[in-house]
Amino acid sequence: MARVKRSVNAKKKRREILKSAKGYRGQRSRLYRKAKEQWLHSMTYAYRDRRARKGEFRKLWIQRINAAARMNGITYNRLIQGLRLAEIEVDRKILADLAVNDFAAFSAICEAAKAALPEDVNAPKAAA
């Protein structure tokens, strides 16, 4: 069986790793072994954080919706409950966008949600 020399392929592989490790600090951008190790970690972090990003955006949308809802005299969870009862299907991304960019439309949605809510049984009764 013929002997296979790997110098061309090995150098190409090392060059690709070092090229993708540009911008890393210290030896991690210059030495192949350290660069490869850091590159593997960075790919793992990128994979993990692409999935985590979705949850972070959802948290941001909920914070924005809650702040705008409280300006309309209703809490976030009551707003979502009212939207379900009123059968208004608007996702959190759109609600957050309305809260930031079109407050009048968001206020109208809040009023519709308030109207759909049942009377609060825990609210203090008005003196007769």
From Swiss-Prot:
Keyword Ribosomal protein appears in the UniProt entry: yes
UniProt keyword list: Ribonucleoprotein, Ribosomal protein, RNA-binding, rRNA-binding
PANTHER family reported in the protein's UniProt record: 39S RIBOSOMAL PROTEIN L20 (PTHR10986)
HAMAP family, sorted: Ribosomal_bL20
Name the record gives this protein: Large ribosomal subunit protein bL20
InterPro entries: Ribosomal_bL20, RIBOSOMAL_L20_CS, Ribosomal_protein_bL20_C
CDD domains registered for this protein in UniProt: Ribosomal_L20
Native organism: Corynebacterium efficiens (strain DSM 44549 / YS-314 / AJ 12310 / JCM 11189 / NBRC 100395)
Pfam family, one: Ribosomal_L20
Cellular component terms (Gene Ontology): ribonucleoprotein complex; ribosome
Keyword RNA-binding among record annotations: yes
Gene Ontology biological process terms from the UniProt entry: ribosomal large subunit assembly; translation
Annotated function: Binds directly to 23S ribosomal RNA and is necessary for the in vitro assembly process of the 50S ribosomal subunit. It is not involved in the protein synthesizing functions of that subunit.
Single GO MF descriptor: rRNA binding
Similarity section: Belongs to the bacterial ribosomal protein bL20 family.
